[in-house]
Amino acid sequence: MLFRSALATAARRAGLLSNTPGLVTMHMGDGEGRLDPIFYVLDHSDVPAKNLLPTHILRNPGLIDAGADLVRRGGYIDCTAGADDVEVESDALKLYELLHREDVSLDHVTMSSDAFGSQPRFNEEGECIGLTYASPKYLHRTIQILVREGMPLEDALQLLTSTPAVLLGKEGIKGCVAEGADADLLVLDENLNINSLFARGKVAVWEQEVKMKGRFEQ
């Protein structure tokens, strides 16, 4: 625990010296300790809760409960979108329920994904048979599900826009539509399907046709 406190303190100090958030991002697993290491740091050091960001909070009910407690203490949590068509539905419903708990502020919850990160593939015996990658489409799908369940679109979008921008010290640059900000604009149709996309003012997708391609794309 002392090592974790020292790590968080070092990250905060580095952030102060470099004028950056000094954020420690932690990938949470299924362990019984849940967010205990984070609460230990908050109880035994002067590191602010905003410097500690646990991810994959939707992994299990106990972790969700601990995440809600962290938000109530002024901390931030990151909820990872599901990685397949089945998981994205269940995780989106977990997120919807979490956001409607008492004293869980939307201003302190972000959403991310494992987009393009490698993922193991397993057979029916649980043996790893190869690798695949996670798709970014499940962030978009999660937004659609949240709105379907009754969340206002502007609230759902905040998980991916203004809240992470504030947390990462990019307020007024990312996550907003404003003069002088990066012109990252997503145009949705009436069914919240992607119609067009602008990345820093350049057309990446226009009326569902990809215009901006990577180095190895045709």
Where are these regions (language model features)?
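Short, surface-exposed linear patches
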Residues: 45-48, 74-77, 100-101, 131-141, ...
